[in-house]
Amino acid sequence: MDMRRASMCMMLICVSLVLLSGFGQFVICSEEKGTYNDNVVKMKLGGFSDSKNDWNGGKEIDDIALFAVQEHNRRENAVLELARVLKATEQVVAGKLYRLTLEVIEAGEKKIYEAKVWVKPWMNFKQLQEFKNIIPSFTISDLGFKPDGNGFDWRSVSTNNPEVQEAAKHAMKSLQQKSNSLFPYKLIDIILARAKVVEERVKFELLLKLERGNKLEKFMVEVMKDQTGKYE
């Protein structure tokens, strides 16, 4: 009887160990699976956001923009010349996908193009994925002549328009030059924008939200731009 009881005890111990081992593996697998899912969530791709690089004169963005124009010229046997980068946004992929709004010179005329460039810095890899001409939201000719006693009527324009954003940057710099504060202005938002034509020049009226130090301020500004692209 004692031998039989001892055998039964040993069998129960073995079964218990097997069950515990299986449960432990299940827990480990579950934890690993949970960790894997967490990593997947962390790596989910987001939308485009403003580039962290300085796109107003930043060397990295300028290099990517120049690559886009040169690659387009090579593919299409074109002779476009990069003038400047108007806007740069980026999206995290396997590397980064840059979306650039470019001002280029084509046959002596300024035109706006949008380029998408895929970059993997660790592989020294760049690929032009898209390069297309963008028709501006408005020009002097298509604003239309609407006499109101003073010339042209005001027209509401998109705050995302590259021309509006350039005018806002110019206005912010002008405010900074006139300011005696040690804190520089930072453009937070273009709240409203409208434009009209005055003697072959575009006049912008913008409501800007600016940050200076810890203080938010709103400014209504007017900016003039002539046909050569010069601001007043």
Curated annotation (Swiss-Prot):
Q: What's an example GO BP annotation here?
A: defense response
Q: Which InterPro entries match?
A: Cystatin, Cystatin_dom, Cystatin_sf, Prot_inh_cystat_CS
On whether Phosphoprotein is a keyword of this UniProt record, the answer is yes
> Major location, coarse class?
secreted
Q: List every position bearing Phosphoserine.
A: 181
What the entry lists under Gene3D superfamilies is as follows:
3.10.450.10
* A Pfam family per the record: Cystatin
Its domain of life reads Eukaryota
Q: Which PROSITE patterns match?
A: CYSTATIN
Q: Where is this motif: Secondary area of contact?
A: 91-95
GO terms assigned for molecular function:
cysteine-type endopeptidase inhibitor activity
Cystatin domain: from which residue to which, for each copy? 46-135, 152-214
Q: Which GO terms describe its cellular component?
A: extracellular region
Q: Which SMART domains match?
A: CY
Q: Where in the cell is it found?
A: Secreted
The UniProt similarity line reads: Belongs to the cystatin family. Phytocystatin subfamily.
What is its biological role?
Specific inhibitor of cysteine proteinases. Probably involved in the regulation of endogenous processes and in defense against pests and pathogens.
Know the name of this protein? Cysteine proteinase inhibitor 7
* Organism expressing this protein natively: Arabidopsis thaliana (Mouse-ear cress)
